[in-house]
A protein has these predicted regions:
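C-terminal and inter-domain tail/linker signature
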Residues: 1-139
Length: 139
């Protein structure tokens, strides 16, 4: 499977709630460059992060909108949707839907496993959609 296919497979596994299967796509020395407060670094922290998201948003879906390979890296623009059904970062369940944009950049090793991740997630939009942060005026 090429790197773009592996990226799509990662989203599919997460959509199925298969965090362990997702973890199998990550190298043991995986480096996460996105801060995950309160979680272990690396592969185990990333798996804990997605378990936390699935507990709070059981219908979490990540839809790849663009997947762009370049050498040993893949950039994906994606959309995350779900319904807030469980506690999330101290926020009690609201029953509200989220629909946010994200960008993932993954560097793969010669063995086809993900070695590094950089990501951008529109957490402000998510907090506004959950009603935690008021929506501002249009820009």
């Amino acid at each position: 499977m090429d790197h773009a296919g592996t990226m799509r497979r990662a989203y599919d596994l997460l959509n199925d709630g298969d965090v362990d299967g997702f973890g199998d796509l990550l190298a043991d020395d995986f480096v996460e460059h996105e801060e995950l407060p309160g979680l272990a670094p690396g592969k185990e922290g990333v798996k804990a992060f997605f378990r936390m998201y699935h507990a709070a948003f059981p219908d979490l879906r990540m839809e790849a909108q663009d997947v762009l390979p370049s050498g040993d890296k893949v950039v994906a623009r994606a959309r995350a949707t779900g319904t807030h059904r469980g506690e999330f970062m101290g926020i009690p369940a609201t029953g509200k839907r989220i629909d946010v944009q994200l960008v993932d950049i993954i560097r793969f090793g010669d063995d086809g496993l993900a070695r590094e991740h950089w990501g951008v997630f529109d957490s402000m939009a998510m907090m506004q959609q959950l009603g935690v942060v008021p929506e501002g005026p249009p820009v």
